[in-house]
Swiss-Prot record:
Family: Belongs to the polyphosphate kinase 1 (PPK1) family.
Post-translational modification: An intermediate of this reaction is the autophosphorylated ppk in which a phosphate is covalently linked to a histidine residue through a N-P bond.
Gene: ppk
GO molecular function annotations of the record: ATP binding; metal ion binding; polyphosphate kinase activity
Active site: H435
UniProt enzyme class: transferase
Keyword Magnesium among record annotations: yes
GO cellular component: polyphosphate kinase complex
Protein name in UniProt: Polyphosphate kinase
Length: 687
């Protein structure tokens, strides 16, 4: 594949984002326990990166080794570069943990007791805990011709034990494997009286490595080292063969834990011959092995901030506000009747969205509710409201995306519960994930003595997930605008029925009109710039990868259009290249909250068209998903989106990173006045 316009590598871009996340852990202005959390978030992100992106690269190399990546590199060269950078990132992560964060935690009375630091009393407590709580659950596997190397589960914690001696059957013992069941706690609190610290903890691996001999009686343990294997977690569902998506998916889910290995993590002190054996058994090469100085899974430390009651070491809690348009109205329907309502999460509460649905479930005038679900969590008041509505006799239709990665099982469970109470459940369109965030409520109203049906809509950039609504930045729009409501109605009809392409008046919809409308809007700016008029594009999203959009932005820059991009994660566009993209800037905001809203701004001859969307500018969002972009027409709300979603990010000089033409990011440095987008919005909206 030849590359007409220069692009940056996707996998390297993802690692770059995780480097920016890890930089939060090094920032002394970030509270200490939050710095630990950022280290854990980096580990969690890397797990998914290997399960999906690196697994995909390995498959491509096996299937078509001569192919090129979209940025023009050979697959093998790209893989080698990604591995090298990933190794550096992991090394930096563990160095930061052990040399900076853990010593600082110890100074604050938060300590992890390694087995070589246990005194006699601590040792006796640890022995009792191991024998009573751990040993009954563990299953040792001795390796011999009758006990082949087990296929360990994806991301499970395992221990490889080197043994010496003969067992009760006279067999020569060489090696054993112990897998720690997921039911066992990865972190155990040591009693305060024994610890000597305000908060003392022991890792599961410390118990295992010290007492593993109890699992192999009368044998000598020469070494015991932890390891973890990451596997390909993509699910394969043959779209041409399936007759029931839910049944097909339920059959595939167990296989996720046993896919092809893509990464081996071992403790740094693991003997070389043991590492070689693990690599052979995993069918991996040396470059796929990550030797870490400490625990092989730092995600397990994510629970520590929740276990430690030290508000001074965490982000200051906040109370999200609620717009007066809602608090001053008798019901949510009255509030929306008075005008469009914009909610900016997490600064403004997600509760009004729940209240809208809960009121709809109980309102005798409501006759129908339609809802899309992508991610909503295992304990969702929103889903409870949908089930209550169905039990109350409403016509409830829910489009549940069963293929939302890593939420498949949760969504299958919700689909079953919804069907059990009489809701209509559909799974979208096979081959096109439904990623759009839409709620439609149909209500019977009486005006001037005449009854009619009135529609109410909520559209969002983020999921219907109350927990992430406090962690992610997103916009939501509540409206009774007739044209928007009609468009949303038609999209739901398309998702639940079978029909041709829609003609929508207000919404841009993928995989049909969203991509061409974006290109057309950029072209208007190009034409205006060439005519000597003011022209500008500002867009905010999670990722920018789609080549034809990037080509249009390059052309816009060359025509003199000022293009400002706020891309939190991976961006394949090269900014600031003379003659190509010198009029384009790319920023990434990384802070307390995950930047998640998608905003498209086009100057449009002064009309200032503003669209909010669930879609990033990626191939998958524009061509392989059902997405919608919706306009903000109300002038006051439009100014809010521009100010709160775009301008504050462009002015941020504390949490913003600027991309340079080589693809590397450098943190923007504050001048005399510090401007932090998220902190400014917290101060504006929250108490």
């Amino acid at each position: 594949m030849s590359v007409r316009y220069p692009l940056l590598n996707r996998e390297l871009g993802i690692l770059g984002f995780n480097e920016r996340v890890l930089a939060q852990a090094a920032d002394p202005q970030v509270p200490l326990l939050e710095r630990l959390r950022f280290i854990c978030i980096t580990s969690s992100n890397l797990d998914e990166f290997f399960e999906v992106r690196m697994a995909g690269l390995q498959e491509q190399i096996r299937d078509n080794p001569g192919a090129l990546t979209p940025d023009g590199m050979s697959l093998q060269h790209a893989y080698d570069l990604v591995v090298e950078r990933a190794q550096r990132l992991v090394h930096r992560q563990y160095t930061m943990l052990h040399e900076t964060v853990l010593p600082a935690l110890e100074q604050e009375g938060i300590y992890f007791h390694a087995s070589d630091t246990w005194n006699d009393e601590q040792l006796e407590w640890a022995r009792r805990y191991f024998l009573d709580e751990l040993l009954p659950v563990l299953t040792p596997i001795g390796l011999d011709p009758a006990h082949p190397f087990p296929r360990v589960l994806n991301k499970s914690l395992n221990f490889v034990v080197e043994l010496e001696g003969r067992d009760a059957f006279g067999r020569q013992a060489v090696m054993g494997i112990v897998q720690a069941p997921r039911a066992l706690p990865r972190v155990v609190r040591m009693p305060h009286a024994l610890s000597g610290f305000e908060h003392g903890f022991v890792l599961l691996s410390s118990f295992m490595q010290y007492f593993v001999g109890e699992l192999f009686p009368q044998l000598t343990v020469k070494s015991c080292n932890q390891f973890r294997i990451t596997r390909n977690s993509e699910l394969f569902v043959d779209e041409d063969e399936i007759t029931n998506l839910r049944v097909a998916l339920q059959g595939e889910l167990p296989a996720r834990h046993l896919g092809n290995a893509v990464r081996l993590e071992v403790s740094a002190d693991t003997p070389p011959h043991i590492v070689r054996r693990l690599l052979v058994e995993s069918e991996l090469g040396e470059k796929d092995c990550y030797r870490v100085a400490g625990s092989v899974n730092l995600v397990r430390l994510m629970q520590i901030p929740d276990l430690v009651d030290r508000p001074d070491l965490k982000f200051t809690p906040f109370t999200a506000s609620t717009p007066s348009a809602i608090t001053n109205a008798p019901t949510m329907f009255d509030a929306i009747d008075n005008g469009d309502i914009l909610l900016h999460h997490p600064y403004e509460s997600f509760q009004p969205v729940l209240e809208l649905l809960q009121q709809a479930a109980r309102d005798p005038s409501v006759v129908a509710i339609k809802q899309t679900i992508y991610r909503t969590g295992t304990d969702s008041p929103l889903m409870d409201a949908l089930m209550e509505a169905a039990r109350n006799g409403k016509e409830v239709t829910v489009v549940v995306e069963l293929l939302a990665r890593f939420d498949e099982e949760t969504n299958i469970n919700w689909a079953s519960q919804l069907e059990a109470v009489g809701a209509h459940v559909v799974y979208g369109v096979v081959g096109h994930k439904c990623h759009a965030k839409m709620m439609l409520i149909v209500r019977r109203v009486v005006q001037a003595g005449k009854a009619s049906l009135r529609r109410y809509v909520h559209l969002g950039t983020g999921n219907y997930h109350p927990r992430t609504a406090r962690l992610y930045t997103d916009f939501g729009l509540m409206t009774a605008d007739q044209k928007i409501c009609e468009d949303v109605h038609h999209v739901f009809q398309q998702l639940t029925g079978i029909g041709g392409e829609l003609t929508l008046h207000e919404l841009w919809q993928s995989p049909f009109t969203l991509h061409p409308r974006i290109i057309d809007a950029i072209r208007v700016e190009i034409d205006n710039a060439r005519a000597g008029k003011r022209a500008r594009v500002v867009a905010k999203m999670n990722a920018l990868l789609e080549p034809t959009v990037i080509a249009a932005l390059y052309e816009a820059s060359q025509a003199g259009v000022k293009v400002d991009l706020i891309v939190r994660g991976v961006c394949a566009l090269k900014p600031g290249v003379p003659g190509l993209s010198e009029n384009i800037t790319v920023r990434s905001i990384v802070g307390r909250f995950l930047e998640h809203h998608r905003i498209y701004y086009f100057h449009a001859n002064g009309a200032e068209d503003v669209y909010l969307s669930s879609a990033d500018w990626m191939d998958r969002n524009l061509f392989r998903r059902v997405e919608v972009a919706f306009p903000i027409r109300d002038r006051k709300l439009k100014r809010r989106v521009i100010a709160e979603g775009l301008s504050v990010c462009l002015g941020d000089n504390q949490s913003a990173w600027q991309m340079h033409s080589d693809g590397h990011y450098r943190r923007r440095r504050a001048g005399k006045t510090i401007r932090n987008a998220q902190l400014g919005l917290l101060a504006k909206f929250c108490s």
